[in-house]
Amino acid sequence: MDHYLKKLQDIYTKLEGHPFLFSPSKTNEKEFITLLNQALASTQLYRSIQQLFLTMYKLDPIGFINYIKTSKQEYLCLLINPKLVTKFLKITSFKIYINFRLKTFYISPNKYNNFYTAPSEEKTNHLLKEEKTWAKIVEEGGEES
């Protein structure tokens, strides 16, 4: 948990020019949610955090579709880090993650589903390139060059 939150903090500081102090404790839920909302305001920061969440929850496109189709509890049972999940479930706006993923493509869940269930080589290559770019941004903790 701390590793990912530190990454999130580093990305925020690099892109916004100042730190956003927070911790994942129950008492600081609102601050954490505020950070996520602020992240949505910056395209680079938004993409970095979107990729970070993908990494945290081990989600791939199929996993994400399953997330939409199943209840939160059912899907979260499949995740690798139960402790992390437990902490995030205490944050009432946990589903903000879905917004991160969907807003990336500016499409609805159904269109997102169709997008991935009818793959083409060009589309797949485009997505792989995007994901690699975002992964690089997260890894470097900053903007793409």
Curated annotation (Swiss-Prot):
One of its GO terms (cellular component) is virion component. It is found in: Virion. Induction: Expressed in the late phase of the viral replicative cycle. Its main location: virion. It comes from the Viruses. Keywords: Late protein, Virion. Belongs to the asfivirus K145R family. This is Uncharacterized protein K145R. The lineage of its organism: Viruses, Varidnaviria, Bamfordvirae, Nucleocytoviricota, Pokkesviricetes.
